[in-house]
Amino acid sequence: MTTNSLTQAGQNSNSLQLVGLTPLVKLNNVVPTNGANVYAKLECFNPGGSVKDRIAKAMVEDAEHRGILKPGSTIIEATSGNTGIGLAMVGAVKGYQVLLVMSENMSAERRMILESFGAKTELSRAEFGMEGTIEKAEELLAQNPDYFMPEQFNNPANPAIHRETT
């Protein structure tokens, strides 16, 4: 992270402005002397704690830009964790309700993190795995036409943000 990035990090009005301002650390003992320079990108420095903050912010802002996510909408998504945390954080900052569908075998701690951002959770049966979680989210979406589902696994904004910023 450059001095300029550090200065920017100290002048932001909300946590979303910090997404992606993650430092690089040179790994000095990974390659032989006079070898390649190897760096690690510390995505854990994102406000929600993972690289998934990038995709959550990107998918929501892309939907806003395209006019399919409007004030008062609810974001719904199937998740196993970090994307859900990112969406819960983005929703909290931007004022959206967030409903996250996850397997019943997800930890209570993970659910508490989501709920601390104001998100609601709906549990799917563990034996159906992620496919069952996605199906349950799609059923809820069909019943609530004002909901928006980012569809992280099919959303072009997901890989695009990595190409642009990671």
Residue map of PLM features:
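PLP-dependent amino-acid enzyme catalytic core
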Residues: 1-166
